[in-house]
Amino acid sequence: MASVCGAPSPGGALGSQAPAWYHRDLSRAAAEELLARAGRDGSFLVRDSESVAGAFALCVLYQKHVHTYRILPDGEDFLAVQTSQGVPVRRFQTLGELIGLYAQPNQGLVCALLLPVEGEREPDPPDDRDASDVEDEKPPLPPRSGSTSISVPAGPSSPLPAPETPTTPAAESTPNGLSTVSHEYLKGSYGLDLEAVRGGASNLPHLTRTLVTSCRRLHSEVDKVLSGLEILSKVFDQQSSPMVTRLLQQQSLPQTGEQELESLVLKLSVLKDFLSGIQKKALKALQDMSSTAPPAPLQPSIRKAKTIPVQAFEVKLDVTLGDLTKIGKSQKFTLSVDVEGGRLVLLRRQRDSQEDWTTFTHDRIRQLIKSQRVQNKLGVVFEKEKDRTQRKDFIFVSARKREAFCQLLQLMKNKHSKQDEPDMISVFIGTWNMGSVPPPKNVTSWFTSKGLGKALDEVTVTIPHDIYVFGTQENSVGDREWLDLLRGGLKELTDLDYRPIAMQSLWNIKVAVLVKPEHENRISHVSTSSVKTGIANTLGNKGAVGVSFMFNGTSFGFVNCHLTSGNEKTTRRNQNYLDILRLLSLGDRQLSAFDISLRFTHLFWFGDLNYRLDMDIQEILNYISRREFEPLLRVDQLNLEREKHKVFLRFSEEEISFPPTYRYERGSRDTYAWHKQKPTGVRTNVPSWCDRILWKSYPETHIICNSYGCTDDIVTSDHSPVFGTFEVGVTSQFISKKGLSKTSDQAYIEFESIEAIVKTASRTKFFIEFYSTCLEEYKKSFENDAQSSDNINFLKVQWSSRQLPTLKPILADIEYLQDQHLLLTVKSMDGYESYGECVVALKSMIGSTAQQFLTFLSHRGEETGNIRGSMKVRVPTERLGTRERLYEWISIDKDDTGAKSKAPSVLRGSQEHRSGSRKPTSTEASCPLSKLFEEPEKPPPTGRPPAPPRAVPREESLNPRLKSEGTPEQEGVAAPPPKNSFNNPAYYVLEGVPHQLLPLEPTSFARAPIPPTTKNKVAITVPAPQLGRHRTPRVGEGSSSDEDSGGTLPPPDFPPPPLPDSAIFLPPNLDPLSMPVVRGRSVGEARGPPPPKAHPRPPLPPGTSPASTFLEEVASADDRSCSVLQMAKTLSEVDYSPGPGRSALLPNPLELQLPRGPSDYGRPLSFPPPRIRESIQEDLAEEAPCPQGGRASGLGEAGMGAWLRAIGLERYEEGLVHNGWDDLEFLSDITEEDLEEAGVQDPAHKRLLLDTLQLSK
């Protein structure tokens, strides 16, 4: 029995049939969930080990904890439970024998194995495959030259001898023999295979036997044809095909049924390539031999690309009202961009029809500053004289024109850059379900991103991209023919001979990657893979293909998939995705502990995902006719599943502004053909966005989606081709000018502490593994030195600095380290299995003081907890030199005053993704989160929310770090010298948004010394939860354009996974493992002890230490990032009884009514819209003068301190504040256990406090 994962088959260990307690490919988290639902001591199951191929894991529930034992095979295929040193090993031939022994008491396990836990199996109906896994009915294909179809020889006239194996009536040679075989299989053996699949089998032995018997004659015939074609090929090509030779030699070797089928498929593939290429070889050979044949024109190996013509843009100068009065009317300019010449010409038309023009070379254009509020406004900083700059703000015709102008200037900068290697490249992604029909001759609109949605401007469509990636499904064209078609189309379009990097196929699912000739030598470590997701992951027409490679120092991954079809098959599509995520073998083999979503700097996932719309067909058609897509996006299955964290955890997708791409009437884009005749009856296929492009990038990297749409003129298929173009930052293969690091100038990565909250019912110890390309080898920590849990489903584990290694990067240059990332995996000591993985960017960790990070853990595509810590990257002072990247040249200006403002808030383009670490300010800690929602902004007419504002570089606004050439200055004002501080290169905050502080409590570490002061410590800023769908502000908010808005707004870095509307958030000062839950109320109505609200603090009273004040700030912060409580809610339906005086953490779903409403896929929950930001600033200004830092109610720390002094218990004030009870308004809900945690141990004092609070109610 073959294993899907490629691991040794457990068939021998399991016997003839898999028992009910064995679960193939079950994840650790799912196993714990099954055991938690069983709920009885002695419940057990066996699953495949995640850490050792061919091994098993025995999971046992005892006292609500899951204990895991590894079952390892030895050299003689005997099985044994891994034991401690000195304990005798017991060997077993099968798992059944092993389970039988340990079902008896006192055999060394934590308890006897009493109750086997079976999996939740949902048998498919017999006609299920007809409904979802069979290709759609297609019209007959027209005859083509080089056809890949092959007839099966049958009938008594065949010269081949009959096979010697016994024949059955199903295999008789009749004109319809294969149909008879299919009929016999469905009548008899189908049920046996179905039972085998239910029992955990990964293959279909009876179907395999039937297919082998039916295709045996085809084997012989194909061998004959291949032999003849090989001889013919030798005549013309003078060389034989090694693949054909090897296939013919393997024919004499004994093969199993599955091997025969695989061999047949491979032969047919080779035969297809032979048939498509034999005519070209013959023609070339005959032309060479014929003296009368005209010589073929010599083609250069690399043709020069078409030159980009000079492009002109009509703009108006943006001036103040006073300047407009002086001038008389707005000035009109023409901006001419000469990419080839490296010049920008400003042409001004004057009243007397004279023209005044000024030319700026590329090196005198210092910075472009995009206005965020006015989408068609752009500031350009010019160099007038040495160290003097001038900024001019221009208003373009539309936001799309502004984006085209920026792209041309970036291309000009890149073309004339003195750098040997590029900082940024453009990537084209295309996906198309071709419907098993050959493509039309002209697919230029797909290649050039023309059509519906967010398309490129006509000025930039002809600019060639650096990398083209084409993913197709139901592509009946041969691999070589398809590749030639793509290269020919690109050559005709760009005059460049693009180089194929990789081509991978699985059935009719194909992915092809082509790059510019100049980049061919920058590509390395190419890898390809495929995964089948059909019946039992072995047969069917669905699956995925993938390609990965390194572009200099940046890793790329591309996955093209075709998932299960059918409106009702959402769960199966989700499982398809998880199978691909786990089984696709791409990227660095040393990162096998991580799934492919964490192996690459940039991962693009696209294809026919087949997620549909859950809405009545007539409603869908009405919305489409009115071009109202927002209501449809709310019921899009992919959006809903991502919101539930089921698939594509923390992936991003650009805003969808084009109509559904499926299912059109072939030959037209005016009509959706939503009726389909199936063998089981008429099916309804509602119009849907089946074809999608998503991506996931490491934090603190640069990626912008410039277009996302579909064509409207390619009509051969019932799907429309979809395109997306991306601007991606890349790194070079860094070579230090100072050579390798010596001991004296070595860089160090040092950890002060790490804390993880892991979703598990296990109570084992854990360790952390650290991986990075900047390390010579991976490193391990010691086991954690502290752990605690107040909830059975979660475990808090902590490591102090003693348990954490000091990492030594291979290079110490900051320019190298700021592009590096650290991969972490939290593994258990008992089974060495991963409980969660994450990635941390080093850029924000560089400095002499420790910075804090916070991110989420995931495993097998599921969120499994979060991790936070304190670390620093120490870089020698002589290696601090760095340079500006090309993508840092364009900035975002949140301030609409433009050049009139002395210090506008500017965000560098390179800092699109920021880490969760930055220095807090007094303003940040003082703004209550509730203010964000006091004045909800009205939605735009289309129903789409405005995009969240970009982060503002706080460091730049307080202490500008821009270089002189990048700092917008007023004319005639000398730029100040640049200020560099590499203590933390990226402190970025959102103006007016309260920032949640989540520092590590020093007292939470058993062995970590409490620092004497927190003056220089940086509190963690928790990233706001958001669904990774990028939104651009709608035109109309300060813009006069009728066209698409241009700028793409990337998310903040460490983008947390999207939370559903029902998500519950924990305050950082409350332990997520012990937080009480209010029953019987909705979240919005709950009046239990919410987190104490932040408010302005009074001056430090005498004797108060900065550390205690910092803890008070922490206790008052509001944290909306952690979804641990939500994970606890969904982990299991078991409602464990709480301890005395404590509410249960897991509420009954029937009792906790969660608010539901229309999902907002674009706006992070904690990002205020622009107008709300202004009100926040006003509110902060009003709140600041409040006496004693209190609120209008007069309740606060001062009131609580006075109350404690009045009853003679002021000694407990510090402990209560430290635990978050700093407000009398919420102190009335404190429990006896909460008092104990705050340090109130005296029973008399506890009773006095509680009685006094009761009387004050």
UniProtKB/Swiss-Prot annotation:
Compositional bias of kind Basic and acidic residues: 119-132, 952-966
What information about domains appears in the record's comments? The SH2 domain interacts with tyrosine phosphorylated forms of proteins such as SHC1 or FCGR2A. It also mediates the interaction with p130Cas/BCAR1. The NPXY sequence motif found in many tyrosine-phosphorylated proteins is required for the specific binding of the PID domain.
Which segments constitute the SAM domain? Answer: 1195-1257
Principal location class: cytoplasm
| Motif NPXY motif mapped to chain | 984-987
**Where are residues bearing Phosphotyrosine located in the sequence?**
887, 987, 1136, 1161
Q: Where in the cell is it found?
A: Cytoplasm, Cytosol; Cytoplasm, Cytoskeleton; Membrane; Cell projection, Filopodium
Explain what switches its activity on or off, per the activity regulation comment.
Activated upon translocation to the sites of synthesis of PtdIns(3,4,5)P3 in the membrane. Enzymatic activity is enhanced in the presence of phosphatidylserine.
Q: Which Gene Ontology terms describe the biological processes this protein takes part in?
A: actin filament organization; apoptotic process; cell adhesion; endochondral ossification; endocytosis; ERK1 and ERK2 cascade; establishment of mitotic spindle orientation; gene expression
Give the source species.
Answer: Rattus norvegicus (Rat)
* Start-end of Pro residues biased regions: 156-166, 939-951, 1049-1060, 1088-1104
Please list every transmembrane segment annotated in the UniProt record, as residue ranges: none
Named from the GO MF annotations, one term is: phosphatidylinositol-3,4,5-trisphosphate 5-phosphatase activity
Q: Which residues carry this modification: Phosphothreonine?
A: 165
The terms describing its cellular component in GO are: basal plasma membrane; cytoplasm; cytosol; filopodium; lamellipodium; nuclear speck; nucleus; plasma membrane
Q: Which domain of life is it from?
A: Eukaryota
Q: How does it assemble?
A: Interacts with tyrosine phosphorylated form of SHC1. Interacts with EGFR. Upon stimulation by the EGF signaling pathway, it forms a complex with SHC1 and EGFR. Interacts with cytoskeletal protein SORBS3/vinexin, promoting its localization to the periphery of cells. Forms a complex with filamin (FLNA or FLNB), actin, GPIb (GP1BA or GP1BB) that regulates cortical and submembraneous actin. Interacts with c-Met/MET, when c-Met/MET is phosphorylated on 'Tyr-1356'. Interacts with p130Cas/BCAR1. Interacts with CENTD3/ARAP3 via its SAM domain. Interacts with c-Cbl/CBL and CAP/SORBS1.
Specify the enzyme's EC class, one word: hydrolase
Membrane topology reported for the UniProt record: Peripheral membrane protein
Q: Where is the SH2 domain?
A: 21-117
- Official protein name in the record: Phosphatidylinositol 3,4,5-trisphosphate 5-phosphatase 2
Q: Name one Pfam family in it.
A: Exo_endo_phos2
Q: What does this protein do?
A: Phosphatidylinositol (PtdIns) phosphatase that specifically hydrolyzes the 5-phosphate of phosphatidylinositol-3,4,5-trisphosphate (PtdIns(3,4,5)P3) to produce PtdIns(3,4)P2, thereby negatively regulating the PI3K (phosphoinositide 3-kinase) pathways. Required for correct mitotic spindle orientation and therefore progression of mitosis. Plays a central role in regulation of PI3K-dependent insulin signaling, although the precise molecular mechanisms and signaling pathways remain unclear.
Q: How is it modified after translation?
A: Tyrosine phosphorylated by the members of the SRC family after exposure to a diverse array of extracellular stimuli such as insulin, growth factors such as EGF or PDGF, chemokines, integrin ligands and hypertonic and oxidative stress. May be phosphorylated upon IgG receptor FCGR2B-binding. Phosphorylated at Tyr-987 following cell attachment and spreading. Phosphorylated at Tyr-1161 following EGF signaling pathway stimulation.
The UniProt similarity line reads: Belongs to the inositol 1,4,5-trisphosphate 5-phosphatase family.
Q: Which residues carry this modification: Phosphoserine?
A: 132, 241, 353, 891, 1132, 1256
Its keywords, alphabetically, are: Actin-binding, Cell adhesion, Cell membrane, Cell projection, Cytoplasm, Cytoskeleton, Hydrolase, Immunity, Lipid metabolism, Membrane, Nucleus, Phosphoprotein, SH2 domain, SH3-binding
